[in-house]
Amino acid sequence: MPQLVRYGRELIRISARGIEFSTNDGRSWLTRYTGSSCGTFMDLLLYGNELLAVTSKGVYFSTNEGRSWLSRYTGSSCGTFLNLTDSGRELLANTSKGLYFSTNSGRSWLRR
């Protein structure tokens, strides 16, 4: 479950304070996002030009390196999201109800 991803020249990670970033390979960290509207961050995935996050409220995305987040999927039919994986052709989600996949960047999910 990646809680740290490389995004261009930065490392971005989940911390107890929210989302942090480093520009010196992790020697020091600065806070980037501390909002609570997304819930608690649990997993990060770089997916194309977006940073995806599994949170306690669903799947969220950022197009600005984690400075702000928007809801991508908050439905309950899939159960609680645990982590995301890029399979190359589709997005996979391990949830409390099993394995789900998405072919539209996480906007909708089908059970595998």
Where are these regions (language model features)?
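Conserved Ser/Thr-centered positions that define the repeating blades of beta-propeller domains
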Residues: 22-23, 62-63, 102-103
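Surface loop/turn motifs at the tips and blade-to-blade linkers of beta-strand repeat domains
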Residues: 33-36, 73-76
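Hydrophobic beta-strand positions in blades of beta-propellers and related beta-sheet-rich domains
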Residues: 19, 59-60, 99
